[in-house]
Each structure stands twice: as structure tokens, then as C-alpha cells.
């Protein structure tokens, strides 16, 4: 079996601890997210396309919750020669260590400052692009408005926020069918019923999805005047908001 294959929840566990981005997860994260999040590769690639169009010379880019650096790498490939700086932040030391290894594997003239820290503590300024790629959902709900407000204040006029999230639906039948289709997606990618069940239990207390309308209301309330959901597959979506 490949050491980078996600088998974290493949064995029966009497006690399921809350999910955390520790060294075990960091070691298999690329496999885990590819097999768990429909459209993840497209989202990553398109973040690079957004960067190509929105990142201005001599500005900063923020990847908040950068994990292994997939979005940062996608952005960096598209903004060569613009004298920009990418600030990539994650609060998991294990993720940051592996992210640095991934960044070191490619030569670039774009500086990346990699920070192990809490995204809520990061000062944002002179930003032309901010990315929250499946990150906001792990923050306590009461902290989300303040982070979006900080991002809005730190973005330059015309700057872009890319926000990707697992979402929920107020409409119960829609929630049920899209959630089941997502589970079918995971089954098709080789996850067993045991793995699906145990991971759901691990995430229950740490990931709290919002509805699309909640996201839009939050963004509008903080000042964003342009908003769209550019991608959705089942109960996963990626949104853009322009200042």
C-alpha cells in the first residue's frame, strides 16, 4: 500500500478523536482531499487563472489555510515577474513543513512567506488576491465575520477573494440528496463505509458549514459589492467576491 494513501480511518476505533491536521493527515492530505472533495483539482487550477487576471504588480497575495501549498503553487506559476509576494499561512506545523518542501521543489522569482500561525492574527494589507480554500468552515462561526471584515479592509479596490467551502442547505430534501451523492463520490474513490462513518464523526465538532446565502450575506455585509458562486459540485462550492 502506498504510504501517501489515506487509510487513517480504515481500522475500527473505539474512540474517534476530533479531526486535526496533524502529521498523519499531512502525510496523506493530497490523497485525502482529492478523494473527498469533488472538483478540487479544477478549483486549484482556476485559482491560478484568477491570480493571472487579478494580481497586480507590487501587491500581496494571501493564502489563508494553505495546507500543503497547492493553491500557492498554482498562483505562483501564474504571476511570475510581477514583483509580488505571497503570504501563505497555516496553523499546522506538520502542514507547513510539507508545504515548504513542496515550495522548494519549484524555482520561482515570486517570494513566498510561509507562516505557521493563526489566520485570525495575520495582518492583511496591499492585497490584490486573498484565498480561503476550505478554511473558513473550520473557524468557530462567531469568528467568521471578523475575518471577512479584515480581508475586505486589506484588499485593494478591485481585489478578489476566492472562498471555497463545503456548504449545507436549508432545504432538507436537497441537503439529503446532495450529501448522498457526495458519499457516493467517496465510495467511488475507494473509501469504505467504515472510513466514511468514522471520518464524519471526527469532523462533526470541528467543521461547521454555512449555506451559500449565509456566505453571500456575510460578504455583502462586510462591503463586497460583487459576488458569484463560480463552481459547485454537490455540497461543495467555490465563490468569488470583488472589492
From Swiss-Prot:
EC number(s) reported in the record: 2.1.3.-
Catalyzed reaction equations: prephenate + S-adenosyl-L-methionine = carboxy-S-adenosyl-L-methionine + 3-phenylpyruvate + H2O
Signal peptide feature range: none
Gene3D superfamilies: Vaccinia Virus protein VP39
Keywords: S-adenosyl-L-methionine, Transferase
A Pfam family assignment: Methyltransf_25
GO molecular function, one term: S-adenosyl-L-methionine binding
GO biological-process terms attached to the record: tRNA wobble uridine modification
Enzyme class: transferase
Residues engaged in binding S-adenosyl-L-methionine: 40, 65-67, 90-91, 118-119, 133, 200
PANTHER family: CARBOXY-S-ADENOSYL-L-METHIONINE SYNTHASE (PTHR43861:SF2), TRANS-ACONITATE 2-METHYLTRANSFERASE-RELATED (PTHR43861)
Quaternary context: Homodimer.
Similarity annotation: Belongs to the class I-like SAM-binding methyltransferase superfamily. Cx-SAM synthase family.
Free-text function comment from the UniProt entry: Catalyzes the conversion of S-adenosyl-L-methionine (SAM) to carboxy-S-adenosyl-L-methionine (Cx-SAM).
Protein name per UniProt: Carboxy-S-adenosyl-L-methionine synthase
Organism: Shewanella oneidensis (strain ATCC 700550 / JCM 31522 / CIP 106686 / LMG 19005 / NCIMB 14063 / MR-1)
Amino acid at each position: 500500500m502506498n504510504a501517501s494513501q489515506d487509510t487513517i480511518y480504515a481500522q475500527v476505533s473505539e474512540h474517534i478523536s476530533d479531526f486535526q491536521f496533524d502529521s498523519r493527515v499531512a502525510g496523506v492530505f493530497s490523497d485525502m482531499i482529492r478523494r473527498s472533495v469533488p472538483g478540487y483539482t479544477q478549483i486549484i487550477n482556476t485559482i491560478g487563472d484568477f491570480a493571472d487576471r487579478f494580481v497586480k504588480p507590487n501587491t500581496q497575495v494571501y493564502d489563508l489555510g494553505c495546507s500543503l501549498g497547492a493553491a500557492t503553487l498554482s498562483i505562483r506559476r501564474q504571476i511570475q515577474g510581477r514583483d509580488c509576494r505571497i503570504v501563505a499561512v497555516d496553523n499546522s506545523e506538520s502542514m507547513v513543513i510539507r508545504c515548504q518542501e513542496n515550495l522548494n521543489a519549484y524555482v520561482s522569482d515570486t517570494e513566498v512567506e510561509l507562516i505557521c500561525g493563526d489566520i485570525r492574527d495575520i495582518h492583511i494589507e496591499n492585497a490584490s488576491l486573498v484565498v480561503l480554500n476550505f478554511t473558513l468552515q473550520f473557524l468557530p462561526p462567531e469568528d467568521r465575520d471578523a475575518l471577512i471584515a479584515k480581508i475586505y479592509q486589506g484588499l485593494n479596490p478591485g481585489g478578489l477573494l476566492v472562498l471555497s467551502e463545503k456548504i449545507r442547505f436549508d432545504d432538507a430534501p436537497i441537503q439529503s440528496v446532495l450529501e448522498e451523492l457526495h458519499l457516493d463520490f467517496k465510495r467511488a474513490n475507494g473509501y469504505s463505509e467504515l472510513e466514511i462513518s468514522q471520518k464524519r464523526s471526527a469532523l462533526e465538532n470541528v467543521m461547521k458549514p454555512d449555506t451559500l446565502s449565509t456566505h453571500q450575506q456575510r460578504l455583502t455585509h462586510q462591503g463586497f459589492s460583487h459576488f458569484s458562486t463560480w463552481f459547485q459540485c454537490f455540497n461543495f462550492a467555490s465563490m468569488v467576491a470583488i472589492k
